[in-house]
């Protein structure tokens, strides 16, 4: 059995007060992000660091990021290729243990991670709690999956996998992609969304602290059209996991379709793009509850999530009343 992650009861004054205390301590904290590589990275001019601001308060600087250079990309690829064989040969129990330790670290630092999520990506407390918990659950889920495989099951790693994650769930989806690739014996180069590199740096540092070798998981913050394009076109990338727009997914699809793996197989692309989600309401539903659920689903996180409500289907007998209440 896999234990569920711990959370916060925001209706309880005591944990809420503790969270507010942490938030006040970190209110003016400036986080930093830069390439995190298996080899020593190139020296970055701090004067070129890019400010990351709070999307809910643009005047508030949350941190700074030094985006990866072309040289950083090459160093990361070289380090990953060198680490491929040893990580693939690492026992699955040890790979799973690394993920579980990383989950424990995230859970222990949930308050700090929540505050950073609120400041860097505009999360509410409730959404920040849910995001950290989802990241923890992803790590433990994939660890448990590999542990429960039959002893004679063969899991053949691809090699080095590129993980490109979105800004709307910059810790949960970021961690889920990486966890799935790592536990299967792959090395990972993670390219976070350019808007949210700070939380990504924290996650990679926790994975390192949990025992994942530096060359096995690396971080390359930067733009999709530069860092992402250079990585996706490189023959050393043997798989891509992407969450984002359909437009970019199609570009990646065309890119990987131009080449094959060393053994002649297509390069896997796992792409999660936008959703078209419907809520179907029958005539027995409580109209007041439907309105609350529809508004929350459509507009929570400003509607910027793949699971957000797009289409509301209602029974003709109740449509007029429901639409009036929605308005």
Please give the residue ranges for each predicted region:
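Conserved small-residue-rich beta-alpha loop and adjacent elements
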Residues: 148-214, 288
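Beta-loop-alpha module in the N-terminal Rossmann-like domain of NAD(P)-dependent dehydrogenases
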Residues: 161, 168, 224-230, 246-249
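A structured beta-alpha segment of the ubiquitous adenosine-cofactor-binding alpha/beta core
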Residues: 151, 218-241
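ALDH superfamily catalytic-core signature
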Residues: 209-211, 233-234, 239, 246-327
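Structural signal for hydrophobic
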Residues: 161, 185, 217, 237-240, ...
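Active-site proximal loops enriched in glycine and acidic residues that flank catalytic Cys/His/Asp
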Residues: 54-56, 65-69, 115-121, 129-132, ...
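Terminal low-complexity tails and localization/encapsulation signals of metabolic enzymes
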Residues: 1-78, 82-85, 89-108, 115-116, ...
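Generic, well-ordered alpha-helical scaffold segments in large soluble proteins
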Residues: 76-86, 101-105, 109-112, 116-120, ...
């Amino acid at each position: 059995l896999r234990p569920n992650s711990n959370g916060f009861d925001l209706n309880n004054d005591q944990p809420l007060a503790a969270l507010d205390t942490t938030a006040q301590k970190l209110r003016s904290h400036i986080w930093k992000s830069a390439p995190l590589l298996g080899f020593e990275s190139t020296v970055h001019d701090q004067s070129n660091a890019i400010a990351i601001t709070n999307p809910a308060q643009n005047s508030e600087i949350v941190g700074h990021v030094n985006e990866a250079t072309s040289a950083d990309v090459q160093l990361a690829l070289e380090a990953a290729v060198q680490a491929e064989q040893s990580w693939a040969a690492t026992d699955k129990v040890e790979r799973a243990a690394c993920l579980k330790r990383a989950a424990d670290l995230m859970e222990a630092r949930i308050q700090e991670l929540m505050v950073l999520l609120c400041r860097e990506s505009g999360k509410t407390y409730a959404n920040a709690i849910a995001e950290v918990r989802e990241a923890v659950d992803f790590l433990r889920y994939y660890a448990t999956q590999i542990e429960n495989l039959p002893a004679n099951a063969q899991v053949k790693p691809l090699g080095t996998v590129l993980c490109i994650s979105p800004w709307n769930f910059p810790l949960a989806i970021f961690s889920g992609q990486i966890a799935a690739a790592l536990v299967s014996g792959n090395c990972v180069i993670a390219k976070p969304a350019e808007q949210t590199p700070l939380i990504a740096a924290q996650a990679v540092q926790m994975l390192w602290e949990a025992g994942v070798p530096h060359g096995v998981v690396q971080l390359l913050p930067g733009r999709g059209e530069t860092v992402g394009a250079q990585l996706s076109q490189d023959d050393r990338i043997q798989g891509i996991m992407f969450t984002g727009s359909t437009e970019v997914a199609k570009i990646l699809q065309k890119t990987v379709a131009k080449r094959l793996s060393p053994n002649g197989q297509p390069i896997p692309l796992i792409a999660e793009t936008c959703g078209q989600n419907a809520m179907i309401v029958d005539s027995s539903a409580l109209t007041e509850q439907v309105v609350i659920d529809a508004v929350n689903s459509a507009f929570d996180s400003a509607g910027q999530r793949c699971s957000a409500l797009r289409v509301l289907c209602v029974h003709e007998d109740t449509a007029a009343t429901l639409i009036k209440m929605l308005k």
